[in-house]
């Protein structure tokens, strides 16, 4: 097999820099990382200096993802020799157990890490990832709640918990998680949109009014958010037809729905469709949105 350096006429320095760029971008192009990284390790390890260790880690994770356990094990052994007893290396061992579906061994290893260092967030998150991989959402929810008791500012964890509650159809708790996120990220249109979707799914006049409000807020933050625009149309339409709504509320929401429909129509026209095609496309969208439910992004 041709070497990467010969195939693409690149130097080892360029290959090293490419690996760094992929790390910084958190790229998951595992096949390319394995190809470039394996050549760096085999041919240029002596030239890489201290960069070799982060490259071993990077290549190992990519190798697990790519199904190259032989390469992953080689990298892990090199890291163990250099950093015996390191929690970071132990976590990599746990990730290899996960790739081999030795979930119990991985959980035990992460538990030992946490006994020695209760603040090790990486080990906690790996445990949660295992529960999710096993389809044990209830246990994953419990683990995440325990984690958030100690690390309340972890926004990624709050969003992950919201997604798990949505999967379990516990919309009230999902809404609470998203409220926490909106408090710290008031300008994030996606959080506003997802909160609106949760409220829409819960149903009832009060929730529908909140849904419409937050779909509108999502649009205010990003006027190109078509999902929020569809949501605004549907929530306003449902409020307008709700028998518990006052006459004024119905009238106002008919206006909101009409405005949203006109914006959707304009968006279709702007996309280059003819008026006839737009009419039928919009009708199809409206029919689809009659069954609007939360879907995973």
Swiss-Prot record:
Family designation: Belongs to the EMC2 family.
Protein name: ER membrane protein complex subunit 2
Role summary: Part of the endoplasmic reticulum membrane protein complex (EMC) that enables the energy-independent insertion into endoplasmic reticulum membranes of newly synthesized membrane proteins. Preferentially accommodates proteins with transmembrane domains that are weakly hydrophobic or contain destabilizing features such as charged and aromatic residues. Involved in the cotranslational insertion of multi-pass membrane proteins in which stop-transfer membrane-anchor sequences become ER membrane spanning helices.
Consequence of changing residue 160 to A: Loss of interaction with EMC5
Entry's Gene Ontology BP terms: protein insertion into ER membrane by stop-transfer membrane-anchor sequence; tail-anchored membrane protein insertion into ER membrane
GO CC terms, sorted: cytoplasm; EMC complex; endoplasmic reticulum; endoplasmic reticulum membrane; extrinsic component of endoplasmic reticulum membrane
Family matches, as PANTHER family: TETRATRICOPEPTIDE REPEAT PROTEIN
Entry membrane topology: Peripheral membrane protein
Subunit structure and binding partners: Component of the ER membrane protein complex (EMC). Interacts with WNK1 (via amphipathic alpha-helix region); promoting the ER membrane protein complex assembly by preventing EMC2 ubiquitination.
Any one Pfam family match given in the protein's UniProt record, by short name: TPR_EMC2
Entry keyword set: Acetylation, Endoplasmic reticulum, Membrane, Repeat, TPR repeat, Ubl conjugation
Transmembrane segments: none
PTM summary: Ubiquitinated when soluble in the cytoplasm, leading to its degradation by the proteasome. Interaction with EMC2 prevents its ubiquitination and degradation.
Effect of mutating residue 122 to E: No effect on transmembrane domain binding of tail-anchored proteins
Chain positions found as N-acetylalanine: 2
Effect of residue 200 to A: Decreased interaction with EMC5 and EMC8
Species this protein is from: Homo sapiens
InterPro entries in the cross-refs: EMC2-like, TPR-like_helical_dom_sf, TPR_EMC2, TPR_rpt
Claim: Secreted is one of the keywords in the record: no
Per-repeat ranges for TPR: 87-120, 155-188, 192-225
Organism ancestry: Eukaryota, Metazoa, Chordata, Craniata, Vertebrata
Effect annotated for changing residue 61 to K: No effect on transmembrane domain binding of tail-anchored proteins
Gene: EMC2
Documented effect of changing residue 95 to K: No effect on transmembrane domain binding of tail-anchored proteins
Modified residues (N6-acetyllysine): 255
